[in-house]
């Protein structure tokens, strides 16, 4: 990385901004899509996400102080950082700011003053968005999430019922664009740090056990537009590395480079890019497994390969390989897929390596181990049947590896091959396999308290982490 000292030369960016906005403000206004529903218009929404310090608020201020000609409503977490001259009014635990329509076209700002915009705030967020949409005075709504928020729960808010009625928020609004801002000067280091939010004293609650890398991945994977910000503070090589990795993580996203969060507004407002089903069902790693391969990005210094096998791993041997850390997986930036462990032969192991964090989760049952009446929906059956091969059915190893030029494919494949059952072990059968030492333990039960919490969220997946010392992966 090349360290540079940031210079606040605002004159040139300001001239460039004015030049662009004068020529495009009218076009942006003309192209704003409004869909008639029950006699009123749906309110388009953009959500801004990104880790702390990435430049979200700078982007928001840039939008609010631009001559776009739109009446914009805004929901933020920290009003103090939003540069709007207005009076605060306390209303129902929310601070409401109202300004005249002539003041940069900002009509209302709602500060979520009792917490961040995340899963615990979805009900309040739903109420506030509905209020703004029903006023029918705004052309657009922008939601700025907190730096430790994930985009998915915010997007899910737009499918929730309002006060138990038959009306959904989607009847009043149209989720238009999910924007994530990435700080190119710190993102790779944060990605590979192995730290948790608790380590950095940034957790949302005392029970927040999320890792930093998982948060960064969630913010990037569930976005339509990714703003690579602060490009002026790092080398071209660093920017290309980040671009290459993100292209593999989220190949559908629109990537934009920026300095001081300055970007053409047409790229983030009224794009029409968001599709909830598409965003939630087709992550980049799954596209690789399905053959929708991201082209080799040699120019970015990023490459990928898929490891496949049709026999199970020995749990103890696999654990020993994982413990070797960077001696085997050096250069790997991301790895995910499906694994088959002999000690728990009926269970799918969800393999997940990100940065220096390695986990294997219980992802449910192989279709080959289910009875016909237990089969999932027809579409999923068809997808699984594509990977069917006798005598093992859909049981398999299928792992995507994404990394830099130092990633050693032949070494990784050799080490993983040594973890596969030998012909003699394979003949012993499942009953014997189950008696072997099993450090991974996919069949371990969640603690009752964790189970209750996840069931309340409706997101229980019977997942168990196999935690590995992250320091072993550090370069």
UniProtKB/Swiss-Prot annotation:
Residues 440-467 form a coiled coil. A motif (CXCC motif) lies at residues 116-119. Zn(2+) binds at residues 116, 118-119. The keyword Phosphoprotein does not apply. Residues 445-460 have a biased composition (Acidic residues). Keywords: Chaperone, Coiled coil, GTP-binding, Hydrolase, Metal-binding, Nucleotide-binding, Zinc. Residues 302-420 form the CobW C-terminal domain. It catalyses: GTP + H2O = GDP + phosphate + H(+). The keyword Zinc applies. GTP binds at residues 50-57, 119-123, 229-232. It comes from the Eukaryota. Residues 445-475 are annotated as: Disordered. It is an enzyme of class 3 (hydrolase). Gene3D superfamilies: CobW-like, C-terminal domain, P-loop containing nucleotide triphosphate hydrolases. InterPro entries: CobW-likC_sf, CobW-like_C, CobW/HypB/UreG_nucleotide-bd, P-loop_NTPase, Zn_Chap_cDPG_Synth. Zinc chaperone that directly transfers zinc cofactor to target metalloproteins, thereby activating them. Zinc is transferred from the CXCC motif in the GTPase domain to the zinc binding site in target proteins in a process requiring GTP hydrolysis. Belongs to the SIMIBI class G3E GTPase family. ZNG1 subfamily. This is Zinc-regulated GTPase metalloprotein activator 1.
